[in-house]
Amino acid sequence: MKLDIVLIMFVTFSTTLAQHDEREEWYPFRFGNGHVGCSNRLGMSENDFCRKLCNQDGKWRNSKCKEHYCYCGPQRFYRVIKL
């Protein structure tokens, strides 16, 4: 009986976590009045550059580059700074 409950909970949570990225809302990264593109002159890949832009305020966010524009997800975790 306990094993059945644990199994049901495991399947429910793993399914929820697996589908989480699909339901996540993505927001375009904006600077001024424009939408920021992923291309850069720093020699970084588009995904790395987009990640750097989305996380510049010290908060963990998912990021993605879609159609050469940068999109940021909602805040995940605060960064922990080790001294």
Swiss-Prot record:
<keyword id="KW-1220">Voltage-gated potassium channel impairing toxin</keyword>
<keyword id="KW-0732">Signal</keyword>
<keyword id="KW-0964">Secreted</keyword>
<feature type="signal peptide">
    <location>
        <begin position="1"/>
        <end position="18"/>
    </location>
</feature>
<dbReference type="GO" id="GO:0015459">
    <property type="term" value="F:potassium channel regulator activity"/>
</dbReference>
<keyword id="KW-0872">Ion channel impairing toxin</keyword>
<keyword id="KW-1015">Disulfide bond</keyword>
<keyword id="KW-0632">Potassium channel impairing toxin</keyword>
<protein>
    <recommendedName>
        <fullName>Putative potassium channel toxin Ts20</fullName>
    </recommendedName>
</protein>
<dbReference type="GO" id="GO:0090729">
    <property type="term" value="F:toxin activity"/>
</dbReference>
<comment type="function">
    <text>Reversibly inhibits potassium channels.</text>
</comment>
<dbReference type="GO" id="GO:0005576">
    <property type="term" value="C:extracellular region"/>
</dbReference>
<keyword id="KW-0800">Toxin</keyword>
<keyword id="KW-0528">Neurotoxin</keyword>
